[in-house]
C-alpha cells in the first residue's frame, strides 16, 4: 500500500494511505515522505462489531468486497479506502456471517505494520 509519513509522537508514527490514517511503530522519517506499507493478511483480526478496550492501536471500518477460499483458508477483501486482504478461517466466516456487502472492523497492532522506502 502506498502511503505518506505523518506526525510522530512518543513511540508511534501516523501513516496516511489515501484517506485512511493508521498508527505504526515510530519511524525515523520525515513527515510527507512517501513510503510503502505492508500488513500481512494473517496479522489482521476481523470483527463484525466495533471492538472496545483493546491494546491494538488500529481499528478500521470497511465493507467486505470479496470472499474466496484457497487450500482451506478464507480470504476477504475489505474496502477500507484502500482494499485490504484479511485471512480468516471458515469457522470465523460462518460465525461472523461474513458476506459481500457486510460492514466489518479490521483490528491490528502498530507493530504489525511494516514500512519501507517507496
Predicted regions mapped to residue ranges:
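SH3/SH3-like beta-barrel fold
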Residues: 13-17, 74-79
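Glycine/charge-rich catalytic "coupling/switch" loops of P-loop NTPases
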Residues: 19-68, 75, 87-118
Amino acid at each position: 500500500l502506498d502511503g505518506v509519513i505523518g506526525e510522530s509522537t512518543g513511540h508511534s508514527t501516523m501513516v496516511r494511505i489515501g484517506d485512511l490514517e493508521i498508527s505504526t511503530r515510530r519511524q525515523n522519517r520525515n513527515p510527507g515522505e512517501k513510503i510503502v506499507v505492508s500488513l500481512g493478511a494473517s496479522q489482521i483480526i476481523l470483527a463484525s462489531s466495533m471492538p472496545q478496550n483493546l491494546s491494538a492501536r488500529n481499528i478500521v471500518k470497511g465493507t467486505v468486497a470479496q470472499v474466496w477460499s484457497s487450500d482451506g483458508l478464507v480470504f476477504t477483501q475489505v474496502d477500507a479506502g484502500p482494499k485490504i486482504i484479511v485471512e480468516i478461517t471458515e469457522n470465523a466466516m460462518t460465525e461472523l456471517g461474513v458476506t459481500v456487502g457486510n460492514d466489518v472492523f479490521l483490528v491490528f497492532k502498530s507493530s504489525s505494520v511494516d514500512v519501507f522506502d517507496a
